[in-house]
C-alpha cells in the first residue's frame, strides 16, 4: 500500500527531495483513466519495481541518464509522471534489453515494459540526444539514491526538439504541456540562454531558433496583475 507523505505541487523550484517511486506510483494510482478502464498493473507493486530496475542498471554497469518527466521533477515541484525516460546508447541498451519487454521501437526510441513499469529509452543515435548525454548531464540525490540526470539546459534542448516534432505531428495539446514546462523552468532558474542559442545552431534551423527566442522573450516579460 502507499506509504508516501503527500507532496503538494508548488510549480516552483523544488525544495524537497524527489522520490522516483512516489512520483510514478501517484501518477498511476490516481490516474482517472486507470480507474475508469482498469489498471494494467497493480500500482502498489510499482515502487519496488522502480527500485528493482534502478538496481539492475547499477548491477549491469549501464551508462545512462534520466531525462523526461522525472528529470524535470528534480528541478520543479510539479505534477507526477507515470513512466521513466532513459537516455542511452544502443550499445548500453543491449545490456538490458533481455530484461524488458519491448513494446515499440524506431531509430530514436525504444518503448519497453519492466514488470509493469513503463520505460522509454531515448537512443543517442539521435544527434541532440547524444549531445545531451555527453555534455549536459549531472547527478541528483533522489530518495532512492544518487543517479545521473540531464541538466536544465539539456532538458530545454530536448524539449525544443520534441516541440518541433509535435508541431509536425499536429499534437498541439502536448505542445502546450512542453512549452509550459519550459516556461516554469525559465521563471524559476537563471538560464544561460545565449549558450543555449549557440548550441541550438547545430541542431535547429534559424527559423526554428527565432521562434524559440520569441517564446522565451514572452516568458521573461514582467508579470502584472491583470485583475488589479
Question: Over which residues does each language-model region extend?
Answer:
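Compositionally biased terminal segments of proteins
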Residues: 2-228
Amino acid at each position: 500500500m502507499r506509504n508516501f507523505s503527500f507532496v503538494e505541487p508548488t510549480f516552483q523550484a523544488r525544495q524537497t527531495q524527489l522520490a522516483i517511486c512516489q512520483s510514478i506510483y501517484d501518477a498511476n494510482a490516481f490516474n482517472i483513466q486507470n480507474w475508469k478502464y482498469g489498471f494494467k498493473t497493480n500500482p502498489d507493486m510499482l515502487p519496488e519495481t522502480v527500485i528493482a530496475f534502478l538496481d539492475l542498471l547499477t548491477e549491469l554497469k549501464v551508462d545512462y541518464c534520466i531525462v523526461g518527466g522525472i528529470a524535470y521533477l528534480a528541478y520543479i515541484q510539479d505534477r507526477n509522471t507515470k513512466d521513466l525516460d532513459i537516455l542511452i546508447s544502443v550499445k548500453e541498451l543491449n545490456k538490458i534489453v533481455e530484461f524488458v519487454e519491448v513494446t515499440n521501437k524506431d531509430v530514436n526510441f525504444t518503448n519497453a515494459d519492466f514488470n509493469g513499469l513503463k520505460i522509454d529509452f531515448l537512443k543517442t543515435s539521435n544527434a541532440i540526444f547524444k549531445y545531451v548525454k555527453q555534455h549536459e548531464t549531472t547527478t541528483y540525490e533522489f530518495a532512492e539514491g544518487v543517479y545521473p540526470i540531464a541538466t536544465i539546459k539539456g532538458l530545454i534542448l530536448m524539449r525544443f526538439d520534441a516541440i518541433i516534432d509535435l508541431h509536425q505531428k499536429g499534437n498541439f495539446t502536448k505542445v502546450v504541456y512542453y512549452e509550459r514546462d519550459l516556461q516554469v523552468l525559465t521563471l524559476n532558474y537563471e538560464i544561460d540562454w545565449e549558450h543555449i542559442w549557440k548550441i541550438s545552431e547545430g541542431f535547429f534551423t534559424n527559423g526554428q531558433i527565432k521562434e524559440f527566442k520569441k517564446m522565451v522573450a514572452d516568458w521573461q516579460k514582467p508579470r502584472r496583475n491583470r485583475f488589479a
